[in-house]
């Protein structure tokens, strides 16, 4: 799979206020997500390393207690098991990259197909 077209994928409701399309490789998961204005993603952690690249909007991240507002062109790197949360200050479009594969997202896709 050398190319990904996020426009042709099935749009999934990932969490309340977060929807998008997913793609997986052997070792990674990629998500092109729309985050509704005001969406509050409560603090959590996971085994995955994550990079969140903001394509549109303003997204406030808290990673290990360090807070930063990300805007278009900015990204956040979240190490494995790091506690983090986010709040959409506007509607946002983001590209999230996770490694290893998000098996919970794979299961969600199977459940909804």
Locations of regions flagged by a protein language model:
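Conserved short histidine dyad/triad with adjacent acidic residue
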Residues: 16, 31-45
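A short, N-terminal "cap"/entry segment at the start of jelly-roll beta-barrel domains
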Residues: 1-27, 111-113
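Short acidic-glycine-tyrosine-enriched beta hairpin
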Residues: 65-80
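Ligand-binding loop in jelly-roll beta-barrel domains
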Residues: 80-104
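A cytosolic small-molecule/anion-sensing beta-strand core signal
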Residues: 55-56, 71-72, 90
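Short strand-coil-strand connectors
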Residues: 26, 62-66, 89
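Short, conserved beta-strand element in jelly-roll/cupin
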Residues: 34-35, 46-61
């Amino acid at each position: 799979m050398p190319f990904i077209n996020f426009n042709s994928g099935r749009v999934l409701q990932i969490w309340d206020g977060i929807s998008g399309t997913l793609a997986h490789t052997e070792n990674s998961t990629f998500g092109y997500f729309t985050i509704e204005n005001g969406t509050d993603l409560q603090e959590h952690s996971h085994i995955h390393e994550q990079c969140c690249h903001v394509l549109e909007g303003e997204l406030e991240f808290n990673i290990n207690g360090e807070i930063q507002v990300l805007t278009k062109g900015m990204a956040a790197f979240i190490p494995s098991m790091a506690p983090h949360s986010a709040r959409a200050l506007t509607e946002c479009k983001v590209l999230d990259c996770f490694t290893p594969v998000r098996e919970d997202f794979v299961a969600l896709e199977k459940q909804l197909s």
